[in-house]
Each structure stands twice: as structure tokens, then as C-alpha cells.
């Protein structure tokens, strides 16, 4: 599991990750938002190695984080990658959606993806804590968990495409 908290500025002219995967940190990044606890569940079972079924399993990611009054509300992304690390998809919370639940700046949020549209296979689940515009990464954990999905169908590729088939004259 790779966990990274940016504490030293990384100088790149455009804010894009450099060859080490780092993005520039803002000044005093220790006082900014941070992940406190993240839990991944598949079909109501929490863990780091989870098993489910394509098209019917429900993925939930519960995130407890620390916000900062000096910084605009952060954003969180849940990233699904292949077992080799290739990003397949991501879900970002809306800008301004995270606010502190109490005086200490703690916030609790949940990401839910019902009826997982992923085909059979093994996938990584990662969580990224970003600045309010989604440009800078404060902290990430990837992989946080792995999910293994089974499917009895003949589908090809990582996604099971929805849609309807109909015959017509």
C-alpha cells in the first residue's frame, strides 16, 4: 500500500505531477486537509481483500478526514485501477461538498457505487484527497483495498456496458 503525504514543495512549473508522481504542495501543507480513516466495503463487508459479483455488488468507501479553516473545502476521489495500476475510472465529490461536521474540522463522507459495472477480475481501490479545485493532491492511499469480481457471462473488457437490445423491422 502506498500512502503519501506531501510535506515539502515539489517544484514543477505547471502543477502537473513530476516523474516521481508528486504535485506541488502548498505552503504549510501539514495544516491542510488530511485523511484520518478510510474503510472500503463490498456488499456490506469491510476489508482489504474483498470478493463480489459483477453487475450486482455494491462498493462503499467511508472516508473520515480533517478539514482546515485556512483552506477551501477539499475534494475526495475514489479511483478504481486494474491490478497492474492502470486507472479504469474515478469518482470525484463535487466542489464544496465536504464541510466540517464539528468544531475540530472532522468530516465524514461516503462514496457508493451500486451494481458495479466492472467485469470479472481483480481491481485496486484508491482514495485521493485533493485541493478544492482538484488540481493538487494532499494525500493518497492506493491501493487501499482490492476487490475480486466474478461474472458468469461472456462479456469482454473491464466494463460491462449497459444498454438495451431490441429487434425492429
Role assignments for model-derived ranges:
Residues 1-169:
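Localized sequence-composition bias
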Amino acid at each position: 500500500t502506498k500512502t503519501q503525504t506531501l510535506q515539502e514543495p515539489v517544484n514543477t512549473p505547471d502543477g502537473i505531477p513530476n516523474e516521481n508522481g508528486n504535485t506541488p504542495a502548498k505552503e504549510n501543507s501539514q495544516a491542510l486537509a488530511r485523511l484520518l480513516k478510510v474503510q472500503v466495503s463490498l456488499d456490506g463487508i469491510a476489508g482489504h481483500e474483498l470478493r463480489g459479483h459483477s453487475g450486482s455488488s455494491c462498493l462503499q468507501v467511508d472516508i473520515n478526514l480533517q478539514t482546515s479553516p485556512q483552506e477551501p473545502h477539499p475534494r475526495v476521489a475514489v479511483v478504481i485501477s486494474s491490478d497492474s495500476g492502470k486507472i479504469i475510472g474515478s469518482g470525484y465529490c463535487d466542489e464544496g461538498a465536504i464541510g466540517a461536521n464539528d468544531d475540530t474540522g472532522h468530516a465524514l463522507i461516503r462514496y457508493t457505487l451500486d451494481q458495479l459495472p466492472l467485469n470479472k477480475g481483480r481491481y485496486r481501490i484508491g482514495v485521493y484527497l485533493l485541493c478544492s479545485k482538484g488540481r493538487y493532491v494532499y494525500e493518497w492511499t492506493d491501493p487501499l483495498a482490492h476487490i475480486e469480481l466474478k461474472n458468469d457471462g461472456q462479456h469482454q473488457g473491464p466494463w460491462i456496458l449497459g444498454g438495451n437490445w431490441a429487434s425492429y423491422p
